[in-house]
Amino acid sequence: MASSSGSKAEFIVGGKYKLVRKIGSGSFGDIYLAINITNGEEVAVKLESQKARHPQLLYESKLYKILQGGVGIPHIRWYGQEKDYNVLVMDLLGPSLEDLFNFCSRRFTMKTVLMLADQMISRIEYVHTKNFIHRDIKPDNFLMGIGRHCNKLFLIDFGLAKKYRDNRTRQHIPYREDKNLTGTARYASINAHLGIEQSRRDDMESLGYVLMYFNRTSLPWQGLKAATKKQKYEKISEKKMSTPVEVLCKGFPAEFAMYLNYCRGLRFEEAPDYMYLRQLFRILFRTLNHQYDYTFDWTMLKQKAAQQAASSSGQGQQAQTPTGKQTDKTKSNMKGF
């Protein structure tokens, strides 16, 4: 067991979930693989120190409860306190899209990008129908399921989510400026950089940058050097604003530029036309003669790796993933997928 999780050995939470090993870190805490000792089922456990300066696991657990039942929303098993921790027990999921991008040597085919776009738009739309915006749309926060859910995309990490309208009155939050940037600068909308209160349009614009990240391998505002975080954010913002959508999307189907221009043109309170955006990509998908068969790029690679492993007389090295760019975290997240 890794030293980081050594102190958690024999740590049982919620009366029946025994921690096994650390499998990742969220924005505000560590995530562990755990086993339900009553039936052997594997689950994920998110731990947050009760001494955390900005505790948010209770808030996140409440949000998951509001979202329960939605397609691609993890099921919550238990929330409570154990020893010095706030604890959230939820479905165990597979690797993130960032992990899978690395697994595929940081190249996704257009077919994979378009199949993902369809599910990603639907996940964000569902959160919006529940009166919340996510505010941290990025590849790390989309995870594939496992087992019978292995082709289903899940949206996670609602610690930064915010209610944008009242459940009963449907009153939208007011337009404001001078807000600090919430979320991840690489994928943040231009308005978020400008300090404008986020709304539905910003989640959708962020998704546009995620899709172009997958298409291009990187975004023009990645890798900028600066002395401070604030200066780096300013450089990212400047580069993002000075890169025309047509330049960002050059060499890729026009639908990606259409998507981003549409999102950037939305008014603060305006509801995005999710079906229009899905149809943009669905029609492109059909035009390119692809079949919606859930055969993603990693599906093929996993099959190849399994065949290599089988034909290499049990030498585990042959089954290694085909890129040297992974972290140990990527490897651990790919196991059992």
Swiss-Prot record:
Residues 309-325 have a biased composition (Low complexity). It catalyses: L-seryl-[protein] + ATP = O-phospho-L-seryl-[protein] + ADP + H(+); L-threonyl-[protein] + ATP = O-phospho-L-threonyl-[protein] + ADP + H(+). SUPFAM superfamilies: Protein kinase-like (PK-like) (SSF56112). The modification N-acetylalanine is found at residue 2. The modification Phosphoserine is found at residue 4. Its EC number is 2.7.11.1. Keywords: Acetylation, ATP-binding, Cell cycle, Cell division, Cell projection, Centromere, Chromosome, Cytoplasm, Cytoskeleton, Kinase, Kinetochore, Mitosis, Nucleotide-binding, Nucleus, Phosphoprotein, Serine/threonine-protein kinase, Transferase, Wnt signaling pathway. ATP binds at residues 23-31, 46. It is an enzyme of class 2 (transferase). The active site is at 136 (proton acceptor). Its main location: cytoplasm. GO terms for biological process: cell division; cell surface receptor signaling pathway; cellular response to nutrient; Golgi organization; intermediate filament cytoskeleton organization; negative regulation of canonical Wnt signaling pathway; negative regulation of NLRP3 inflammasome complex assembly; positive regulation of proteasomal ubiquitin-dependent protein catabolic process. Pfam families: Pkinase. It is found in: Cytoplasm; Cytoplasm, Cytoskeleton, Microtubule organizing center, Centrosome; Chromosome, Centromere, Kinetochore; Nucleus speckle. GO terms for molecular function: ATP binding; protein kinase activity; protein serine kinase activity; protein serine/threonine kinase activity. InterPro entries: CK1_Ser-Thr_kinase, Kinase-like_dom_sf, Prot_kinase_dom, Protein_kinase_ATP_BS, Ser/Thr_kinase_AS. GO terms for cellular component: beta-catenin destruction complex; centrosome; ciliary basal body; cilium; cytoplasm; cytosol; kinetochore; membrane. It comes from the Eukaryota. Belongs to the protein kinase superfamily. CK1 Ser/Thr protein kinase family. Casein kinase I subfamily. PANTHER family: CASEIN KINASE-RELATED. Casein kinases are operationally defined by their preferential utilization of acidic proteins such as caseins as substrates. It can phosphorylate a large number of proteins. Participates in Wnt signaling. Phosphorylates CTNNB1 at 'Ser-45'. May phosphorylate PER1 and PER2. May play a role in segregating chromosomes during mitosis. May play a role in keratin cytoskeleton disassembly and thereby, it may regulate epithelial cell migration. Acts as a positive regulator of mTORC1 and mTORC2 signaling in response to nutrients by mediating phosphorylation of DEPTOR inhibitor. Interacts with the Axin complex. Interacts with TUT1, leading to TUT1 phosphorylation. Interacts with FAM83A, FAM83B, FAM83C, FAM83D, FAM83E, FAM83F, FAM83G and FAM83H (via DUF1669). Interaction with FAM83H recruits CSNK1A1 to keratin filaments. This is Casein kinase I isoform alpha. The gene is CSNK1A1.
